[in-house]
A protein has these predicted regions:
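Helix-loop-strand module that forms the ligand-binding subsite of alpha/beta enzymes
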Residues: 71-161
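N-terminal beta1-alpha1-beta2 submodule of the flavodoxin-like/Rossmannoid cofactor-binding fold
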Residues: 22-105, 115, 182-193
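Second-shell loop/turn segments in exported
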Residues: 34-41, 108-111, 136-143, 170-174
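Sec-dependent N-terminal signal peptides of Gram-positive bacterial secreted proteins and lipoproteins
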Residues: 3-21
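Glycine-rich phosphate/pyrophosphate-binding loop and the adjoining helix
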Residues: 161-193
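Extracytoplasmic/periplasmic soluble domains downstream of a signal peptide or transmembrane helix
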Residues: 23, 29, 62-64, 140-142, ...
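Short, well-ordered secondary-structure micro-motifs
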Residues: 37, 74, 148, 175-176
């Protein structure tokens, strides 16, 4: 019986990996400019992590780009994000995912801002039908790990299957490509991909 279960799990993992690229999307929000613990960067920490995930899975990419940019300065961005959290704001973003229905697996990436998912990511989640989709969160942080973002996504998307997410320190995503690639590879392997 154990051999049969192992065989079936192996087949399921191979099938999932083979079909992942065709039906997978990596969508993410990232902040360039001044980032905590990494300084001023041209490409945000989460963008770097998202691109590694897309490269390793063959998934398509969609960046959640705000209509109104967040301030480049860390302190000003902190003030803007805190105000959004306090007010429950839903900032608008540019463009949208083409052919949403073709994607079965959605990776959702974001930085953890003061223990929370940035509100613009909630805008994206609330604007799309995730029923029947597999959602895989990932985030960058500087000490808070996933915070409670896994639970928040599960609560926001009750009709989706939410798999275990990945948390990578922003400084690692920004400055250590090898460690980031290994963290992603290990995580995907743990998910059976």
């Amino acid at each position: 019986m154990k051999k049969l279960i192992s065989l079936l799990l192996g087949i399921a993992m191979m099938t999932m990996g083979a079909s992942l690229a065709e039906g997978a999307l990596v969508t993410y929000f990232s902040h360039a400019g001044e980032n905590y613990n990494v300084g001023v960067v041209e490409e945000g920490n989460t963008a770097k992590l998202a691109k590694v995930i897309a490269e390793q899975t063959g998934a398509d990419l969609f960046e959640i780009v705000p209509v109104v940019d967040y301030p480049q300065s860390y302190d000003e961005c902190l003030e803007a994000a805190t105000a959004e959290q306090r007010e429950g704001a839903r900032p608008e973003y540019m463009g949208d995912v083409e052919n949403w229905d073709q994607y079965d697996t959605i990776f959702i990436g974001y930085p953890i801002w003061w223990g929370e998912i940035p509100n613009i990511v909630y805008t994206f989640m609330e604007n799309h039908d995730f029923a029947g989709k597999t959602v895989i969160p990932f985030n960058t942080h500087e000490g808070s790990g996933q915070s409670h973002s896994q639970r928040d996504i599960e609560n926001t998307l009750p009709d989706a299957t939410v798999l275990q997410g990945l948390a990578v320190r922003g400084a690692t995503a920004q400055n250590d490509a090898d460690a980031t690639a290994k963290a992603v590879s290990d995580w995907l392997s743990g998910l059976g991909m």
